[in-house]
Amino acid sequence: MSIHISDEEAEGRNFDQKNKISSHEKNQIINNFIINYNMKKENDINQINEINEINGTNQSVNRKKNMDTVYKNIINMSNNMTQMYNSMNNMSHNIINASHDMMDASGNINSHINDTNNQTNYMMSSHINNIENETNNMMTSQINILNQNPYIRTRHINTDDMNQLDNISSQTSPNINNNCTTKYNDINNSYVNVLYFRKLKLNKKLFEKLKNKNIVIYLKYKDSTCTSEKIEITDPEINNLYLCFLVTEPFLENEKKIVKIYIKCFKDGKYKILSFGFVELNFVDFSEKFYRKKSYMLCYDKKNNKYIFGYFILILANQIKWKVCDNKVFYEYIKKSYFVSNRKNYDQQIFYICKKIQKKLLQSYYTNTTNPYRNLHNQALLKHFSVTHSCPGTFSLNTTKNKNSYDHYKNENDIETKNQNYLYDIKKSKSLIPLNLMKNDILYPQLSHDNYKIKSMIHNSYNIANYTTYKEKWGHENLYEMKKNNSIQEKNDMSMNFKGIEKGTANFLLNHEKNEQIKEYKDKYQKNNTYQSEQNCDIKQYYEKNEQINEYKDKYQKNNTYQREQNCDIKQYYEKNEQINEYKNKYQKNNTYQSEQNCDIKQYYEKNEQINEYKDKYQKNNTYQSEQNCDINTLDIKQVTNQIEDIKSEQNNVYSNITENPFFNTDEYEINHSFNNIHEYNDTDKNEYIKNNVDNEEEESIEKNIFDNIICEKLQNILNNGIESFIQEIQFILEHLKKKIIKKNDYFLNQLKNDHIYEYNPEMNSQNINEHNEEYTLEDYIIKSKYNNNVKNDIMSILQNCLNTTLLYIKCILKDTNINKQEKNIFAAYENIVKNIKQAVSHYVIENETFNHDILNTDILTQNKNISLHTSLSKSRNSITNKNCKLTKIEIQENEMESDKEKYLGHYNKTSNVLKEKNNMNSYINSDETLSSSSLSTCSNESHKKIKLMSRQIEHFKMNSYINENISSAFKYYEHKWKNKLAKIGAYI
């Protein structure tokens, strides 16, 4: 009987034989391993015995016992492993035998055998690796124990054993992934780049007590902080400083809990920030008050043995970026930061960085209107990154070298303004207006009503177009060297774009209907009247002007039909305003209203008067005309005159708003003309609206805007008196003064609310109207006048403090030895100018106090307890409110007011001489000895309206005379001497 053996069975037998050979080899390896360990044990025991024989101490006995127990454990573990290996080998044989039994049932059993064999090999290899690792650890521990014994010598250890130990310890162990270490590799070392450090000298005694104490730096920097340990200060400007800490203006009780930096100096000259901590704040305090603070650093120069005082800005790289939202602190790891590498264009690069950050903040502020917390946070950041606002004089761009810098900035802002609405909610965030745009005479409106929020989107495109035409006209010239008349005209036009939009849209709809009625009246007049006269010629000239406006409107409606609802009415309204401005400017320059070229406003009114005279003749001669046509004629003439009067009243309001804006560089004559010569200006205009509101608007503007009238207007006009680019270089002084006063916002915020309180709250408006009908007592008037005087004194005291700090600042610069003589000479010129300003302000304060005190004394002597201020105003107002009054009445009233003005000025010259003589003041005017108390009492017999008018006019007169006398002479002296040197001041500032 033959037995057939298949190929599969043969392969199974061959596999069994191979398996037996491999298992045998593995048994030999294990046996050799056990033998080696036994030999090692015997050698170690012999060594220990030799040590015990040499030393004869009990320590060796204990070590021997410990070694015996250790090796017993090793032997037991090895025996257990051999048993486990034998059991695994038996399992493999059993699996092979079972596979032979299953080969008849399945032909794919070989793959199953291979899988099981691989599993067994993997398990065995893993166990062997574990055994080797454990033995290595145990052997290293034993070696350490032996090394700790001072009696063991290297000669007692066999070299073969040492090599064997090295071979065992050199085996690689599995890699361990330490997630905690790799996670923070990116932020291991963070570097601080000092963007700006300004050196100023201070008194050493001021901070001498803090020299040996723990130094804490309070960092002002906005939302980037770092918690890593070893932060290096790499800026070369502070390499010689070993003591650095920050002095800030306190605003919280626990200010030391905000941001802390601990710095330590090492022997190698480097400075390490040991710790950098951040403490959570209240969101309101963190966003508003914290960023308003100016940060200063006080350092000690060990070479020159001086304390150095300055302020700095830090930007951190490779740091943790912190975010504060909903009173919680969040952070993220960032790798990129703004660095400045080129030291040549240092200021320009920093300026570019800050303006980029400012631009992003502006975009997020105006686009994200749903999250008020985010907007508040962006508002706080914007206060820091508006470079000229946060630290004046820090960054200076040379306009002579970079002529296209403003054009580049304008193009970027034009792109932004097309996608955004910069007029949105300006009154809630007044500090968000970019200061660079304001310096370059880009006008922003003083919004005072909520309707502008809706209409600003409609008129924004027109405002941008008007701005681009303004820049195309003046882009090639220096913005600070414009011609006076042209700059005033352009500012008037641009301000009318904002201030006259709301009235313009409503008025022009009426004007269109009025012009159509005038055209109908003209056609009827030409048909019915055949004779010609000079009056007729005047009327035709008048109608030709209106016809040109109507033709322009028709052409504009045909060409721009798709913009008819939004822009047509507004642009035609501005065309009318431009024509009236041309008439007014030509009249002010030439004063030749009789010529045909100068079609001024006075000639325009004479034509209207001729029209009225002709209307009377026409109604008498042409009785056959219908009553309806007569009504149309009278209505047309009245509407046209009222229309022109309203437009001129708005123009006069623009003049007052221009003088209130501190960033306008208007002519000194125009500002004096608008404030001091208001009645003479009204002689040319014949404007009833201004006559009715002179007593109210001008009194309030003087009391509320006295700081702007004294400093921002008058000082800028004097600074712009023929000196090229001087206003740009002295801008840091004005910004410093302005910021110091803004910080005293307890009074100024209330004044800002009072400016618009009657527009927002109708109840307060009704109460104010009811109060006009009541009579004020003398006690109420004295209390009110004392309050106004206290307010003025507070403002003037703030101004004097600002001037004192500026003088101290300049003195510190003049005493600094690190500044060259050329720069000191420039600051010496500044010092003389500021001293003259201080002298002018002090004289003004003394004159104002003595004059107000004398007026109050004269009021008390007369004992007039029932003086009605508002009744006198209402009487004068009712006498002029009649719109149909003739021109002769207006002229009579104006002549009376001019005569009163001359009396007041003459009377004040006498009273001021007496006051100056009493106070022993230096004056060039001789005092009148015949003046007695009776002459002083004559002033009390006048009404309070006249007293206020006199005080207002004299107040401006004295203010202008003192400032012009003391400051303009200083500028004329230094104009020729320092004209070339003033351009170099930006390098230091």
Curated annotation (Swiss-Prot):
Coiled-coil ranges per UniProt: 538-654
Biotechnology remark: Possible candidate for an effective malaria vaccine as determined by epitope response in sera.
Highest taxon of source: Eukaryota
Ranges where the record places region Disordered: 1-20
Claim: Coiled coil is one of the keywords in the record: yes
Keyword Coiled coil (UniProt): yes
Keywords, alphabetical: Coiled coil, Merozoite
Protein name: Uncharacterized protein PF07_0021
Organism field: Plasmodium falciparum (isolate 3D7)
